[in-house]
């Protein structure tokens, strides 16, 4: 049966390839791949025992994990070359300050809004930490959470800011540190400023540098486009894995929390659309253009791996400035994450508060929580780890117990898909808003 399963998988891949060749519509093919993957994965889980299912997924993961690794491969070269190239072409370095402020302020404001929405959804759906099942998996997860809490306890804002400054740019280009992406952004920006300075002193030298950087940029972008064409197949394989490994009993047991989480995520997508409308961007057209990128973010559960798609979508489809697109995509992958850094920790903080005698819906607690969530979403870039670290930072800051994080481990992948898509959309929205405001 293994060979039959793989034959069907390959047949679906060929079908997607034929469809893409005929239509040349990447977004449409990605969406079809997502639906086919969901269907095929559900059939695999219901029809086969775990040993055969695991063997089938091992081969399917060659496509899914291979695609994710290809995207991870091009993240650092893309960020480095794109920002260096874009800055080398601009005339005023002070524009960098405006771009940084615009992107970061939009990310933090939308994170605060997402926290408020998360709080409201807990109240609306009456979600509580009481009665959650504690099994062996949950106990093991709680132990890991407490271990990670030790990494957060010594993290201060000054230490976090210092960690952004590149110490060894070559090590950062390998992604060796949690802050490597931001460090590469800073290094490439400084190198771009140095190129501008040389160009002012020696115009001929400046032109040669600009031509060399532009050639390198075109080479990297051609590689990016090669990888992006593989998106339908990567999304298809990733969706199979998700559907085939989801535990439906856990989904039923924690259904209320899942529904509340996705209601908050959906509402935040609406808020993003409203914000875009205010800067004269049609939300419907916007979401049509970004759907392939959101589909990949949803299935891969990786904001960092989505950076190449994010930048390509912003520049090629949304018309955003290259510098703004790079800053928004890279900062948005680590700072001001609307889903992992906003909605999720806010919901947990409200659910846990009654256990220690705090009224989670008092005005003072809500204001404090939103402020802590917004600031903490900036700080988690210093440690990495997404939603888990964000929740640890927020709960620790408020003096709340951390055990709830481990109790939700069984549904973490299901919720994380929606959170990651929202993170990526928040980054693209920040880039689009900043671009429209600075280029009026």
Swiss-Prot record:
Gene3D superfamilies membership: Sodium:dicarboxylate symporter
Pfam families the UniProt entry points to: SDF
Topology term for the membrane: Multi-pass membrane protein
Transmembrane parts of this sequence: 1-21, 29-49, 70-90, 101-121, 179-199, 226-246, 258-278, 343-363, 366-386, 389-409
Coarse class of the protein's main subcellular location: membrane
Swiss-Prot/TrEMBL keywords: Cell membrane, Membrane, Transmembrane, Transmembrane helix, Transport
The organism's place on the tree of life at top rank: Bacteria
Keyword Membrane among UniProt keywords: yes
Species name: Haemophilus influenzae (strain ATCC 51907 / DSM 11121 / KW20 / Rd)
Annotated family: Belongs to the dicarboxylate/amino acid:cation symporter (DAACS) (TC 2.A.23) family.
Name under which the protein is recorded: Uncharacterized symporter HI_1154
One cellular-component annotation, GO: plasma membrane
GO molecular function, one term: L-cystine transmembrane transporter activity
Subcellular location: Cell membrane
